[in-house]
Amino acid sequence: MKSLELTLVEDPIIEKLQANGWTFTPSDQLERESYKEPLLVNPLIRAIKKINKGIGIEEKEIWLAVRELQSRGPGIEAAKQILKFMKEGIPVRLEKARTVEYIRLFDYENLNNNEFIVSRQIIHEGTERIRNDIILYVNG
């Protein structure tokens, strides 16, 4: 039997999001490396390749961008930096071009180039083990 929270809160939210193009993925089917990793790394890499295909980005440079996101710890300053990355992209030096390019995490011009995933009852481990009711992922 479903709990009241699932029936009255989570199900309606998920249904509304699905009606607006979001894909529901059960938490046990998310492409996660561990409970400690908040990012969906494989979808993130796919999105970076798709969104930034015109700048000549290579696998090594994609991983530099991913590591830059992963290296941010908790706290307000880290959150500010991640928000800046989300808005402007992550600066990465491209070896072939010998220039610094901003690797975009989202396609703001063509929203269909982004992957929208909603999931529920997602476990995360940090200083504590928590279970989030609903999490929205855009490009991982």
Predicted feature residues:
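An alpha-helical interface "stripe"
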Residues: 1-140
